[in-house]
Structures are given as C-alpha cells and as structure tokens.
Amino acid sequence: MSDIACIEAREIIDSRGNPTVEVDVSLSDGSFGRACVPSGASTGEFEALEMRDGDKERYNGKGVLKAVGTVNTLIADTLEGMDALNQGEIDHAMRNLDGTDNKSKLGANAMLGVSMACARAAADFLGVPLYRYLGGVHTFRMPVPMANIINGGKHSDNKIDFQEFMVMPIGAASMREAVRMTAEVFHALKGLLAADGKATSVGDEGGFAPDLDNEQALEYIMKAIAKAGLAPRKDVCIALDCASSELFDEGDRRGYKFWKSNPGKLFTAQEMIDLYKKWIATYPIVSIEDPLDQNDWAGYVQLTKELGDKVQIVGDDFFVTNTGRLARGIKEGSCNSILIKLNQIGTVTETVDAVRMAQNAGYAAVISHRSGETEDAFIADLAVALETGQIKTGSMSRSDRVAKYNQLMRIEEELGAQARYYGAKTFERFGC
C-alpha cells in the first residue's frame, strides 16, 4: 500500500553551516523518501516564510527545532494514513492546516521537506525515477546549466555589486559535454585569476570571489572562455543575477546604489536599464535575473519593452515562484522568464503550478538552487520532469552544487538516446 505510515523530521546542517530541515517519509509497504530543504541568503520580500527558532543561544537564532517539531506533530498527525500518490491532496492538506498566505504558521521549510519527501516515497513505491514520477513518460529534455563562476553581492565579501556572473554552455551537444565545457571554463578562470594575483577562494555557490569591479568580472569571464578554447556566444553565453533589490536604496527609495563599489552615486531605473543595454551590446549576455527592485512593477514593464526581445529577463525576487505575482507580470508584460525555487512557495504542487503557468504564457522557467544547499539533488530531477530547459545550480566546486550536475549526468545516461540537450535552441528568440 502507498499510504503514509510515518513522517519524521530532524535538524541537519546546510552548506553554509546553518541548520535546515530533513524529512523522512515511510509508506506502509516500506517504500521510503527523504528530502533536505534549501535556504537563501538573498531572499525576496514576498517569499514564503521559513520557520526559525530565534534562540540566540543556539545557532545564532537560526535553529529549526520548531519546524522539526511541527513536522513530527501537526503535519504528521494530519498526513499519516493519506495516499502518497496523491501529491496534490497532500500539499493541499498542509496548506489548509497552515491557513496563511505565506506559510507562517507551519513554516515553508517544514512543509517543503514533507512535500518533497512524499514525492520521493511515491516514486520509490512505483519503482520509477523521481523525474519520471513528477513528469510522466515523455520527459527527455536536459537543462542548459547556468553555472555561477564569479560571486558578488551578498554571496561574497568582495567589491562586486552584482550577485552572480554565470556561464551557459549553449554549444554543447549533451549534458555531459555541457558539464565538461563549464568545468573547463571554471578552471581557465581560476588560472587567470591566480596569474594576476587575484583570490581563487570560492563563495557560497562555488564561484570565485575575487576583488574586481563589476565589468572586470565580465572581462575575466570572456578571457576564460577563450582560454578554454571555446567561442563566446557560439559555445558559451553569459547570464547575470543582479539581485537588484539588494541594491535599491531603501532610505529615500529613489534609485539604486552600488553599495560595494560606488556608494556615493544613485542610479535611476532607466540608468540601470541603459547599463544593461551597454553590457548586452558588448558581451554575450543572454539572461539577466532581477535587474530591478522587486517592487518596481513599472520599471519592469519598461525594461521588458526595451530589452525583452534581446535577452531573457528572469524574475526571482520579483515573482518568488508565486502564481499570483506571475499572473500579474504576464498581464502587464513584465519579464519573459521566471526563476523557480521550491522553498519560495513551500510545496511541490505549487512549484509545478508556477512552472506550468509560465510555460503556458510563453515564459521560460529556470529551476534554481539556493545559496544554502545540501547534498539533495531534487531540483535536478525536477528540471528534467518539467522540461524547463534551464537549471541554475552553482559552480563546478562544492559537493552541494556538484551533486546536482552529477545527478543530471546520471539521468542523461539513463535516458540514453532519448535524452535531448537543446543548447542554443533554448535562446533562439534572442538570436542564439
């Protein structure tokens, strides 16, 4: 039987040394699923709420024993006996039990751990891979990686204001080749930085964190692509996560400041747009994430009008994997893509709903990790299951990041000749 027999949570540690929630779900026939919940550093104002203990004497207040207790009592009492194959009903039951818009009663971290673990247990019961259980029998598309190779913003202690500088191996013929190309650019960049006396230590997501200015980061990536024997734009493109809500001046709310490199200058939304235009014309940039503040709806409409046919504009903090915010963005013409983070919304079902809404509207969807990760590679299966065609899961270092790439290569091997890596076709509408 596929009935849920036992749900048990525990506190574990994520890649930043902070506590997070791990959940085990056992079914009545012995089938089993386990999931670990990620956590973000740069978080959107409208994300579902993580439940933290707030006890400053323990993990600086970041413990998750309350969330663990919630899983082991309220959630377990509600879900035990339900059919694990009914993912929608399980997630709906937790949402009803919570009763809030932002998951503040149970905590999104508690709910997500259970939701993911139930999906894994159901897949185990059916004897199918997780991607097959979530996506059905016709899912063969492998995602193009967005690999973070230079960290800035909140993810590092350097002077780079923008949070992530990433490479996308669009010229690869397979997932395995995409990983190889990305790794070779990563190592080429390390060599260039070391030769110039720059730091080669890595940030939260495995990318390097040298003390450069924003445009120098782009220049180094261009050199690394060439040093790896690859061609910019043909083989490898660049993607940015600007995390501009972190740059927005909350004091007078008039514009943006490069707090690390040039805190004395204030940039308007139009000046930010003009900067992106300049960079897009100069570098092989194919995707820009969170280019403006999460509350700047008018700015996003204008930016999309000016750049939406030239580059992928990804809403992360702007959409927070929330179908309500996404529906408004679609209606108003804001962005043309959404970043998908499971813990921004708190259940697998709501995550799938957001992806399907985006795809039905002609928006791209990019499955994403968080800066605080674990060895759990759920998002690798999710990207294949939902055929999003893109995944953002960090650099070619740190086992918490590499775990996802390794899982994608395993999936590709399992799919064999049926596997499809679209590469440049993913960005055909932007001239790639």
Swiss-Prot record:
Subcellular location: Cytoplasm; Secreted; Cell surface
GO function term, MF aspect, one: magnesium ion binding
Protein EC: 4.2.1.11
InterPro entries from the UniProt entry: Enolase, Enolase-like_C_sf, Enolase-like_N, Enolase_C, Enolase_CS, Enolase_N
Pathway where it operates: Carbohydrate degradation; glycolysis; pyruvate from D-glyceraldehyde 3-phosphate: step 4/5
Cofactor(s) the protein requires to work: Mg(2+)
GO terms (BP aspect): glycolytic process
Protein residues bound to Mg(2+): D241, E289, D316
Broadest EC class assigned to this enzyme: lyase
Functional description taken from the UniProt entry: Catalyzes the reversible conversion of 2-phosphoglycerate (2-PG) into phosphoenolpyruvate (PEP). It is essential for the degradation of carbohydrates via glycolysis.
Name this polypeptide is given: Enolase
Organism: Treponema pallidum (strain Nichols)
